Amino acid sequence: MYKIRRGLGFFGFTLLVIVLFSACANNVSRNLTSSAELLPSQCRIVKHIMGETCVPINPQRIIAASDSTLEAALILGLKPTGTTTYAQQSDYLRERFESTASVGLDSRLLSLEKILTIKPDLILATDDYGEQQELYNRLSQISPTVIAKWWDGKNIRWKECFQLFAQAFGKTSEAEKIVNAYNQRIAELQQRMGDRLQNTLISIIEIYPDRIRLFGKTKTVSLSSTIIEDIGLPRPPSQEEGMDISLESIGDADGDIIFLMARDPEAQLYQQVMNHPLWKQLKAVQAGKIYKVENSYWGGSGYIAANLVLDDLFKYLLK
């Protein structure tokens, strides 16, 4: 008898769990459907890597699910309702807005529960990890979602992403002014450098706690290396493609000027590089042309960071 009662009890408990789960699932499904529906007159069509999305004309509750989407929103005068923890850790962005709701660590670890709580009317994301289909399938059930292609296999596409985000925000006129101002600064720097422009080899290096990275023209690139390319400054032959190098290959980091980023200046590897005989033999080191720059914006993701990089370039290249 005891065994029969226990079996019935277990069956009843299981049935209760199924009923509750189904009720919750139906409730979430209703929330998802109602959140994603928009009348054609209330939205604009935006084309992106996952197809076309009808986004609201004047979005009020925006989820910026990456640092590049957050940066685009901020420079265009918008404050997202939610973003990732990772995006909020960028010093140069954190200075420009008050804390906002976190919807997960990064685009791979988004909390759908937190996003549902915000009830967004627009979600922007990038395919940072090549998982755009899964990402889109999840997010587009909640709200109109636009996903930009960040990496094309050789370079980051920060400018193209910005244009797409501006279109989604309905801020294309403002975006054009930002792009024009950037291009004007590039032209000014080119003009002021004169003949030095074609005769100054620029090296970009970052020392992590566990590796040394050269940022090249393709493959392992950063926002700063694309800006150097925009200006037309030459790179050392060893930096056509970015890569990680060993301490014994530190000679590949040489140039007329070295811009140096360091994740942790107290780390053992950083100290080893600074004290290594091969480092001390570099032309830029001997000429005193090593300039330490901030990795947060030299490795940034939009026009806020780009202008901070240009500030550094005006400062150091026109000495």
Task: Walk through the language-model features, giving the residues of each.
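Bacterial Sec-exported substrate-binding components of ABC uptake systems
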Residues: 2-13, 20-68, 173-203, 266-270, ...
